[in-house]
Amino acid sequence: MKVTKADIVISAVKPEQYPDGDLPEIALAGRSNVGKSSFINKILNRKKLVRISSKPGKTQTLNFFLINEMMHFVDVPGYGYAKVSKTERAAWGKMIETYFTTREQLDAAVLVVDLRHKPTNDDVMMYDFLKHYDIPTIIIATKADKIPKGKWQKHLKVVKETLDIESGDEVVLFSSETGLGKEEAWKAIHKFTKTKNA
């Protein structure tokens, strides 16, 4: 998809701050510093729409981005960062749970994982959480450029087996450096949004 417009609409922490309307929403989740911001910037053809923080756990709000006036991307705060306090972690959990369980406009989630490494317990918990609430999920296995092409399938197998991916959920090989998987990611996203924009 050609992105001609992408703007941040609001940074929200509670439902009354979520944007009005019935545009489809895609939520983007992932471990702190997994490359989620780079994925969003790459897929939207923007260099700095989402700031890439050197400090993990920096984003503590749900950031809503309006794409081509057609859909919202919702950047979910990264999880699994050890230095976040218990209080902050509890607040994060409540905010995420409220959004994922009550937001009617939510059509699917994108879960960004690092292809180089076996998914963490936090990745597994996040995927299980999404599946518990029957949220269709697209797995973006990023940083494919960091490992030899001949090892991609082996690493993909580890990702699929560790997360115990359901048959309907797609896994897309991705690289924010080379753009690998960009078209495939959009195709997967459009499966969930096109019905509302047909």
From Swiss-Prot:
Start and end residues of each EngB-type G domain: 22-195
- GO process terms (BP): division septum assembly
Q: Which residues bind Mg(2+)?
A: S37, T59
Listed GO CC annotations: cytosol
- Cofactor needs: Mg(2+)
Question: What InterPro entries does UniProt report for this protein, alphabetically?
Answer: G_ENGB_dom (IPR030393), GTP-bd (IPR006073), GTP-bd_ribosome_bio_YsxC (IPR019987), P-loop_NTPase (IPR027417), Small_GTP-bd (IPR005225)
Q: Which terms are listed as keywords in the entry? A: Cell cycle, Cell division, GTP-binding, Magnesium, Metal-binding, Nucleotide-binding, Septation
| Residue ranges of coiled coil | none
Query: What superkingdom heads the lineage?
Result: Bacteria
Q: Which GO terms describe its molecular function?
A: GTP binding; metal ion binding
List ligand-binding residues for GTP: 30-37, 57-61, 75-78, 142-145, 174-176
**HAMAP family assigned:** GTPase_EngB
Q: Which family does the similarity line name?
A: Belongs to the TRAFAC class TrmE-Era-EngA-EngB-Septin-like GTPase superfamily. EngB GTPase family.
Q: What does this protein do?
A: Necessary for normal cell division and for the maintenance of normal septation.
Its name, as the record gives it, is Probable GTP-binding protein EngB
